């Protein structure tokens, strides 16, 4: 494909226009009085959302150079979302401000490399000072962080706080759609482990990059599965019943994995494969725990069992299973509660008998996974559009509270960033000079952007609010339009969220400042209407030959005429 090249100021200007297009769409959502954004969908009703990363992912610009700028800011939002789960809008607003200031200085003749060094020194100092300002989570802080992260929704804050109380901050909390209008909390049997899908082609939800099945069956084995012939009997059986199947094995690879992927993508099977957790004997114990939780049987060579003879009676059953790139969460059915309690009692007896600290740690982990259960927040709303928006808010609140437990809390509303800017002023004036000093000042000026935008979204003059915040040394409460101690008022941010927003914004902005050339694909011209002899559908006559796909890959000899 032919390429388009853009150099120097032209390239940077195009990138900045793309950055602004995306950031201006996202920034209207920040703060408790942030606005909603309506997203057109190819099918069904439009979505109304208040979630920065969801909006960012939807934006695609006509100009190829501007689109690259938008994609770079999408990367900021996605990286912050992946690592912190929240703070995507803050990161986007910070990055936009830094890019604007940085490119303005480059155009005025500043050295891009020195600017970048200054920006990197600034963020290093900010991270140190942020850690000193951070306070440990205590009292009502989890409720407050969840409320702030969900846009001031008190019910969401209460629900997340209650869920963490019931299964602990390290426990498994999932969000699902309710069949009623009410949002409810339920604690049920379940567990999570740190293994994800064997192939991204198993994903069922492209937006969230997860594979999720309701009322699925589990095939548990400590064997490596390479040949599809091992799976033929059980797959044939499930193809008839239509039940989803998740295979948890030492490894699913080669022909077996390829066949599962093809048949899943063609809609022949609802299936996914996951690597079993842990290693060696601990893997066998982990599989046995999952078997007890789900009422299944581990297909093990130690017990002279083979995959070819597996029946549906050997499979575990779950209410729901959610598989991401790195983690799997099982929500079990309640029928196996007695067996789970007996299994926990057995592990506790092992715990009493061992002298090894390492073994005790691993046994305690198993007890926590089995006995802790899963808190399920069932989200209800009058319409599907509101339901999706509410679900996104609850997921943000959950992620923010987990981040708060990890690294603590700081004052919210952009107040902490504004306070940190004072330290950068000293760094710039006392330790640096030239363009490195300018780089520090770029970051310093950008730190007021989130608080300014929160004020604008609340209908106030952003510059006036920033000036008053600095004069009074207080934060701006956008809900009541008053100036107060936001930490004391319970308007909090997770330290980890603020830290990652800063680091990701500086990372992208400093790279854009040092850009001198942009290379983009040249858009292909649209095909002329009626090309092909006047009949635009004329070339499709040859598709009649697809009637021969009944055999789907030639596996009829294995008793699977309908599969690949």
UniProtKB/Swiss-Prot annotation:
Q: Name one GO cellular component term.
A: cytoplasm
Q: Write down the Pfam families for this protein, in alphabetical order.
A: Cpn60_TCP1
The entry marks the following residues as binding ATP, namely: 29-32, 86-90, 413, 493
The keyword DNA repair appears for this protein? no
Q: What is its main location?
A: cytoplasm
Q: List, alphabetically, the InterPro entries matched.
A: Chaperonin_Cpn60_CS, Cpn60/GroEL, Cpn60/GroEL/TCP-1, GroEL-like_apical_dom_sf, GROEL-like_equatorial_sf, TCP-1-like_intermed_sf
Which intervals of the chain are annotated as region Disordered?
Answer: 521-541
Give the GO biological process terms: protein refolding
Q: Where do Gly residues bias regions lie? A: 530-541
Q: Name one GO molecular function term.
A: isomerase activity
User: What sort of enzyme, by top EC class, is this?
Assistant: isomerase
Q: Which HAMAP family match?
A: CH60 (MF_00600)
Its function, per the record, reads: Together with its co-chaperonin GroES, plays an essential role in assisting protein folding. The GroEL-GroES system forms a nano-cage that allows encapsulation of the non-native substrate proteins and provides a physical environment optimized to promote and accelerate protein folding.
The record's comment on protein family reads:
Belongs to the chaperonin (HSP60) family.
| Protein name, entry field | Chaperonin GroEL 2
